[in-house]
Amino acid sequence: MNGLKMKVVILAGGLGTRLAEETQTKPKPMVEIGGMPILWHIMKIYSTYGVNDFIICCGYKGYVIKEYFSHYSMHMTDITLKINENSISFQKSNLEPWTVALVDTGQNSMTGGRLKRIRSYIKNDEPICFTYGDGVADVNISELIAFHNKHGKKVTLTATHPPGRY
């Protein structure tokens, strides 16, 4: 699929109070589903549609997200170590073609404050997709963007009615 020329901004800074037992040691986007973090699943959805440029707005325990991505290649591919040379080489792999900016947007920042802090990562009038780092949905990104472009609006919102919690 052709890559869509845009960035995805993902909010990943909330406390995750409803998942307190999981979020004592990590932020909610790093809670695993099927052995991979929620954040990874969200990024894979966009990547399936050719969108591979991400800005992650880090907050609560953002260092966990930074550590995950800074070690991502090592955990997802074969490596060769030359111990006496203190070198590591990564073998050919099928790693995702992602560019990931991990931005510390403050632990207590609200949504608007997080967006303000990443302003320098987005060019004027550059289209972006914006999503929360704790929601995985079956959305056809290409169709959503085509719908948005067809209607010529500044913002298109995708929403759903969540099922009851109890």
Question: Would you name each region that the model predicts?
Answer:
Residues 1-166:
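Unchanged
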